[in-house]
């Protein structure tokens, strides 16, 4: 059986499709969702949303938000998404290393916070590259 999933930002619909399985980047770890899942509202971390349909995974990088799950429907409300570009494995790895160094070298709380968000995005990009290759 399939479920419906919608990913929405404040200004647009990112996707509205069906899925066999959805994996969300929850605050305490990944949240796997199958058809018939118990009702749940959960906060989302910056990270990789994965949508599986017909044995094919589609990754979407989310920038924080909420998800509402209700049996056969998943609604994801996010601040923003990052478009997946044609980035290669080596480039994604370099971005992750650069983001890791930025966190280590941050001098102020704001720099550390900004760098940690970029680190989460870089990690999600690398995961996305692995799903696309």
From Swiss-Prot:
Q: Which residues form a coiled coil?
A: none
Q: Which UniProt keywords apply?
A: ATP synthesis, CF(1), Chloroplast, Hydrogen ion transport, Ion transport, Membrane, Plastid, Thylakoid, Transport
Q: From what superkingdom does this record's organism come?
A: Eukaryota
Membrane topology term reads:
Peripheral membrane protein
Query: In the UniProt record, does the keyword Hydrolase occur?
Result: no
GO molecular function ontology, one term from the record? proton-transporting ATP synthase activity, rotational mechanism
Q: What CDD domains does the database record attribute to this sequence? A: F1-ATPase_delta (cd12152)
Keyword Thylakoid found: yes
What are the record's GO terms for cellular component? chloroplast thylakoid membrane; proton-transporting ATP synthase complex
Q: In which compartments does the protein localize?
A: Plastid, Chloroplast thylakoid membrane
Disulphide bridges in this chain? Answer: none
Checking NCBIfam families in the record gives: ATP_synt_epsi (TIGR01216)
- Share what the entry says about its subunit structure, partners included: F-type ATPases have 2 components, CF(1) - the catalytic core - and CF(0) - the membrane proton channel. CF(1) has five subunits: alpha(3), beta(3), gamma(1), delta(1), epsilon(1). CF(0) has three main subunits: a, b and c.
Q: Mind telling me which PANTHER family this protein's record contains?
A: ATP SYNTHASE DELTA/EPSILON CHAIN (PTHR13822), ATP SYNTHASE EPSILON CHAIN, CHLOROPLASTIC (PTHR13822:SF10)
Q: Member of which family?
A: Belongs to the ATPase epsilon chain family.
Role summary: Produces ATP from ADP in the presence of a proton gradient across the membrane.
Name assigned to this protein: ATP synthase epsilon chain, chloroplastic
Organism per entry: Phaeodactylum tricornutum (strain CCAP 1055/1)
Q: Which gene encodes it?
A: atpE
């Amino acid at each position: 059986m399939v479920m419906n999933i919608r990913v929405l930002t404040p200004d647009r619909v990112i996707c509205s499709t069906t899925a066999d399985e959805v994996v969300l980047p929850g605050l305490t770890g990944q949240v796997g969702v199958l058809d018939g899942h118990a009702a749940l509202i959960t906060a989302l971390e910056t990270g990789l949303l994965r949508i599986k349909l017909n044995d094919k995974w589609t990754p979407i990088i989310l920038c924080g938000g909420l998800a509402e799950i209700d049996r056969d429907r998943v609604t994801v409300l996010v601040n923003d998404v990052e478009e997946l570009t044609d980035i290669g494995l080596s480039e994604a790895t370099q971005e992750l290393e650069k983001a890791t160094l930025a966190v280590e070298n941050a001098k102020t709380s704001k720099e550390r916070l900004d760098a940690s968000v970029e680190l989460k995005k870089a990690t999600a990009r690398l995961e996305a590259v692995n799903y696309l290759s």
